[in-house]
Amino acid sequence: MLAAAKGLLGHVPLYVTLQRGLGADRLRYRCLDELSLADGDTVIDVGCGPAYYFERLPRVRYYGFDTAPRYIEYARNRWGSDRAEFRCEVFGAEHLSQVPPADAVLLLGLLHHLSDEESRHVLRVAARALAPGGRVIAVDTCYEPRQGRISRWMSDNDRGEHVREPAGFTALARESFEEVDGEIIDDVTRIPSSFWLMRMRKPLH
């Protein structure tokens, strides 16, 4: 039953409806608010999914990457324009010459789907993609000591196979960034859930 429910999330309009119904959209909006983006900024969104939060952005130059064709097709049809580009590709070092340096890189709900080595690679490339003064922000399902039973169940049954404690995410980020900090978010979704919001600045490489 749980596997069937997860499979339904591949249906893009249903996924978007569920995200909003559960309050997960507010989690992403909180990340965007952290960045205080302005018109003309460049944003790279890795693992953008259907990018349903695009309408909350100012008039930025946006590059969204995801490996799910249905998500990218939805995003292109909805938001594609001369300032918003969506690519069904794995974001990597080869893209650094194709997009301008970023004022912000978004990793929203991505790292808990990636192994440690995959996460290291994404974080290294994200660090290299930043313009001077640029920032990376990530948010992921996490484990944390204060979790109640429902929240822990949500972490145990997340679609991501690499849900970590905050220290695990932070250790990976510190390999690529001089400044890393974060906070546990557990008050935005309608079902009790715990998330690690992580801010990264000053690339080491």
What are these regions (language model features)?
Residues 1-42, 46-98, 114-121, 125, ...:
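Class I (Rossmann-like) S-adenosyl-L-methionine-dependent methyltransferase catalytic domain
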Residues 106:
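A conserved beta-strand element that flanks and buttresses the S-adenosyl-L-methionine
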Residues 110:
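Hydrophobic adenine-recognition pocket in adenosine-nucleotide-binding enzymes
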Residues 130-136:
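Short glycine-dipeptide loop
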